């Protein structure tokens, strides 16, 4: 926060989001296109998800946030499936065992980017268990970024979204 305050004195247009820990300067009235769905398994994954969502918005995408829809309460995910299926790309952020990316990969026909998080307990191993689950997924169309890499997922999702927007315009 101290870095933000110092920078904000020199650049008053700088904003800081304490949840995602993103510091940014954005153009006003930015045009956004397409749609990316950013989903979390649990509420503990929201910080990384917000990093992905805000990165995608910064680079020009519309983002639908769908939080706390993990496999332990699959009915919550299924109740939001129609919205998720409209997206050009889906970002699945999950700690613990990381199953959300595989489940989404089996339910949607769009690319899914798995983001393992370091949250969890027991044999979570700082996100390694979620990472291994995601990279060993048998669901087609699932790609995985590194542990807690919301920025990387948001940027990649934006590139995929642009391809979808281009296809819609053609």
Where are the regions a protein language model picked out?
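Glycine-rich oxoanion-binding loops at beta->alpha junctions
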Residues: 22-24, 62-83, 128-129, 145
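Glycine-rich phosphate/diphosphate-binding loop of Rossmann-like nucleotide-binding domains
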Residues: 33-73
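Glycine-rich phosphate-binding loop
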Residues: 79-117
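Short glycine/serine/threonine-rich phosphate/pyrophosphate-binding segments
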Residues: 45-50, 74, 94-103, 124-125, ...
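Helix-enriched interaction subdomains in cytosolic or periplasmic regions
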Residues: 1-18
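C-terminal binding/interaction regions
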Residues: 40, 81-85, 89, 117-170
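Short, acidic/small-residue loops that bind anionic groups at enzyme active sites
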Residues: 15-20, 104-127
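Buried hydrophobic positions in well-ordered alpha/beta secondary-structure cores of metabolic enzymes
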Residues: 38, 56, 91-93, 104, ...
């Amino acid at each position: 926060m101290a870095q933000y305050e110092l920078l904000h004195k020199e650049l008053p247009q700088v904003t800081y989001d304490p949840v995602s820990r993103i510091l940014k300067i954005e153009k006003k009235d930015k045009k956004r296109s397409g749609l990316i769905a950013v989903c979390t398994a649990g509420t503990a994954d929201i910080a990384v998800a917000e990093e992905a969502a805000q990165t995608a918005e910064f680079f020009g995408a519309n983002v639908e946030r769908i939080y706390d829809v993990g496999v332990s309460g699959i009915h919550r995910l299924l109740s939001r499936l129609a919205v998720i299926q409209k997206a050009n790309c889906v970002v699945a952020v999950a700690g613990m065992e990381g199953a959300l990316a595989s489940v989404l990969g089996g339910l949607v026909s769009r690319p899914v980017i798995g983001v393992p998080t370091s949250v969890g307990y027991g044999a979570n191993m700082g996100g390694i268990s979620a990472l291994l689950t995601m990279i060993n997924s048998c669901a087609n169309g699932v790609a995985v970024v590194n542990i807690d890499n919301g920025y990387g997922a948001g940027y990649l999702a934006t590139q995929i979204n642009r391809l979808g927007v281009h296809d819609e315009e053609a």
